[in-house]
Amino acid sequence: MVQQSQDQQVYRHVGYVMNDREDVATLVGPFLQSALAAGEPVVLACPDAMATALAAVLGSDRQVHVVPAEPQEDRPPAALAAMADLIDRDLPGDGRRLHLVTGPGRQDDASAWLQTEALLNHVLAARPVDHLCLMAGGETADTAAAARATHPWLLTAEGLVPSPGYRAPADLLRDLQRAGLPDPLEATEPTLAMVDLDDMRVLRRALNRVLAESALSADAAQDFVLAIDEVTANAAEHGIPPVDVRLWCTPERLLCAITDHGACFDDPLVGYGPAHGDMAVGGMGLWLARRSVDSLTASPADDSGDGCTVRLVVNA
């Protein structure tokens, strides 16, 4: 067993894939009891049955807090914000670490779940938290592989061990993005195409007209227009013209591809946390755009590596 580091400013993300051969409460109990013995709080944000079983093992210690297990948001930015809020509500703030247990929960979108688990290591890096994620082994065929890739630590019958398959969040996200390119919709005729765009007002009017006939609700359409507007304005300001905008609408999903001829940004972590939090100052556009869509990716516009195409996807 590897002893836990005492670094008070490191988010420690621990994965445990459950199986029928092990009693979860018996295995997890000692892991949490050591935290209580050190005077550090434990928060159980699990489904009722799991929270009850763990609380029974831990006893009536006043440092054990059971909170409702909210369904995980499908969109990674929303899921990350919810997790940060949960942690910040209970973080002691006096130098002690918080010990959080979440899951198991249903994962409707395996790709979004994988992105969220990877991004937790980036977004929460400075918080002094030990976060134990419980995962049901039957959720997907490769749950164990996903746990190893997204959790630097694993809880096993032998104790806490480094994950042999852990990958840096940026590397994992790059591979996930590349696997989905090009989007199959791009082989079809776009619903809307605007070449060499030079007037954002014309774009907004066209988007509002087309999206009014789409499968999106009025609020979702407004959010999508906001995201497209932010990315297009960024391309016009920082890229190299011409800027082209193409939109595909189907009953299931919508895709907008914004292309310019400047250099493409290669950091998939950009925009997953506001750089400064001041909406009156620039630099918040990508953060806003990510929160308004189901997926935002950037890649070179062609095989030569020239140009940049940002793809925004919303599931209807």
Q: Which residue stretches match the model-derived regions?
A:
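Non-catalytic sensory/regulatory segments that transmit input signals in bacterial signaling proteins
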Residues: 1-197, 306, 316
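Amphipathic coiled-coil/heptad-repeat helices and related helical stalk/stem segments
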Residues: 28, 116, 228, 282-285
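Short glycine/serine/threonine/alanine-rich loop segments
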Residues: 40, 129, 216, 241, ...
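Short, well-ordered alpha-helical segments
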Residues: 114, 201-205, 287
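Conserved beta-strand-loop-beta-strand hairpin that lines the nucleotide-binding pocket
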Residues: 182-184, 236-316
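Coiled-coil dimerization/phosphotransfer module
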Residues: 186-190, 222-233, 237-239, 273
